[in-house]
Amino acid sequence: MSNTPDQPMVPSSQVPESVVVFELDGTEVTVTDDGLTLLEALRGPLGVHSVKDGCAPQGQCGCCTVLVDGTARVACVTPLRRVSGRSVTTFDGLDSAVRSEWATAFVDHGASQCGFCSPGIVVRLEALRTKAAVSPAGADGLRDGAVERALAAHLCRCTGWQSIVDAATEVLGGSGAEVAVELHGPNDSSRDLDAAARRATLELGAPQVIGADVVAGAVGFSADTAPDGCLVAVVDPDGSWVLGESVVAARRAAGKVQGRRTTVDPVPPLEVPDGDWDLTLRTGWVDAAYVETDAAWCEPGGEPSRAAANGGAFGAKRHSPLPKVAQDLANEHGRAVLALWSREDCSRSAPKRPPIAAGIRADGTGVLRVVATDGIVEKIAAVAPGVEVIEVEVAGPPTSVTLRAAGWAEAVVLIAGIGAPSDVVSVEPATGISPERVVVRTTDGAVAAASVTAAGIVVHVQAGAALD
């Protein structure tokens, strides 16, 4: 069921309509403001798509970071009226040479994967460079840990921090990676970005491209590429789809205030089975926490766009319902429709890792209770054949084995933690020169080894020949 776009709008605030004038990427712009955030204005009437909506209005993911008079700000919690008469710079407004420099460094170091969070990260790091340049010490004014502190305002679930830190170190200077690596930029003739994309696609199990456009966030995300003039569909508090002529109009028609805090305690839903166990483990409803929220658009009679434009989502979007929703609504209303989930919608409705509660003995036998999920028993048995797996029906969010290593990783933790014999997991004891190592071998031949030292956690991965 869906509501039509001509229903009376429910205003989200009592702010009277006014006009806000400010400088955007070097050009003066005028926007009618009736309580908009800066992000809503940028992505709406101003059409700036390098600024992403990953969590609005939580102000936590950093994907909407812009410069306001040179200072990094998250646009989703900045009222539009606050930038009146000021200068706003997005990723698109950075000098082309600066954008190219960052793109080269990010591609060099593998600091982007899907690219959704990259433009906002680059903007904040560029603000860090500007801040250092005006300090008395110049570039040397970047103190140790400055990049890491800047990144604390961002969530990137794909690459891990180190590759981003290394890219920033290359651009900003300072202490970089401990091991020197010969790197080549995206325009280097020795690079094969198509091969890199094939490798990334193999690793992710979903199509992915590699290149400068990824760093710019310009890889065809559905929320960015929907046709001009399309209807926007969002979910109301009752779970029905409500349509409007824009994201703001649809959300106001839905009458739903986006949440910023949960009221649910993170308590694992299953109890550990009775028994005399050497090791136990309980997990809750673990969300994949991908930053690009589910979105898909479709023309009447056409095929919908993909919910995951450039990999990402850790397998959680493999069966996203939004492409089918967009297709059905487009056919129903005879217009292109963009179906859009908010961060809250993803948290409520996207699939989670199946929660488990398990006990295991030193010989590798035990009992593992898991929320009933198609295919989960086979995933766990492949790692822990001596563990009895019991599926339990539990009310809660959807679960799926398509999430990266769902069930499999939890079983690995149990087997490795107890040191039980396994064809998948082995524990190599410490020697005089090497710490204890846990080695994991997948069924398709990949090998990973991890050890804990005083300096940190050391991980080695062998996953086939590097294609690029």
Residue ranges and their predicted role:
Residues 66, 71-82:
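Glycine-rich phosphate/adenylate-binding loop and adjacent beta-alpha elements
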Residues 35-49, 77-195:
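Ferredoxin-type iron-sulfur electron-transfer modules in oxidoreductases and energy-metabolism complexes
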Residues 59-60, 73, 119-124, 316:
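Short glycine/serine/threonine-rich phosphate/pyrophosphate-binding segments
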Residues 2-3, 7-9, 15-33, 48-49, ...:
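Cofactor-binding beta-sheet edge motifs in enzyme active sites
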Residues 33-68:
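A basic, amphipathic helix-loop patch mediating RNA/tRNA/ribosome contacts
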Residues 24-30, 74-75, 95-97:
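Extracytoplasmic/cell-surface-exposed regions of Actinobacterial cell-envelope-associated
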Residues 59, 80, 121, 431, ...:
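Glycine-rich beta-alpha junction loops
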Residues 10-17, 60-71:
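Polybasic, low-complexity association/targeting segments
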